[in-house]
Amino acid sequence: MLAHDRRHAFGPWVFAAAAAYFLLHLYNILYMLNEPENPAILIWRFSGSMGLVPDAMPLIAALPAAAAFAVDLNSGFAVPAVLRSGTRRYLRSKLLAACIGGGLAPFLGRLLFVGLLHVLYRGDVAMAAEMFGPEGAMGIAFTGMAGYVGYFAGVLFVQFLAGAFWALAALAFSAYVPNVLWTVCLPLILHRIFLELDAWTNLPAWLNLSLLQDSETGLSFAPGLLAAVGVFGALIAISAVLFYRRGKRRLTYA
């Protein structure tokens, strides 16, 4: 990865976006802060699926690095960068930066929130099991400490994949329309389009990206994780190919 792109993938925008995502989750549970008797996993369940969190996640993922290609083209930096590094290396660097930066922002935001939950609330698996039972993705969290940790690890991994996709979708768009504002906003628009398609076509829950990114599809843990890896993995690959092909063509005539 080029030094310029490393600053996008691991720089201050990643941590700023992660902090914003963390604060959105915290805002959703403000009314429950005076209820420390609740189990942490119950508060977690409510925090991620309410309010602005699902809708804002695509924007959070796009902030760190998705617009880097558009910025380079508009500033004239792309041409000398390609001359120094070569087209293939330059485009791969942009893909890697968007993937890592887009995935890390929601991942770190939720990881910090998980830590806070287990400071404010009890990690009571038994009580949560009584409330929710063994159904759905949360079922594995009720099988002991290994399942409890595994549940959160799986959900955080899905968040990383979802963030990587939204960022790469925006990056691919920027190769066709190198406008910074439109590039950053594209994931929000795309997210709404997917929601409307789901409402009109009645697709399975595991194809609803809003539910899938929050592991709320109703599937048990392993099938839900496989569905997320398959769906987001395929979308990541498609976005990467679209960006690489169009980006290469655009740089040829830059």
Please report, for each region that a protein language model flagged, where it lies by residue.
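Aromatic- and glycine-rich beta-strand/loop motifs that create alpha-glucan
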Residues: 1-18
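Central hydrophobic cores of alpha-helical transmembrane segments
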Residues: 17-21, 180-194, 207-210
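Secretory targeting signals
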Residues: 25-68, 96-175, 212-230
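Helix-loop-helix units of permease transmembrane domains in multi-pass membrane transporters
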Residues: 68-104
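Helix-loop interface residues and adjacent transmembrane-helix termini in multi-pass membrane transporters
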Residues: 84, 176-177
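Juxtamembrane non-transmembrane "cap" segments at the membrane-aqueous interface
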Residues: 120-134, 189-207
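Junction motif at the cytosolic side of a transmembrane helix
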Residues: 231-254
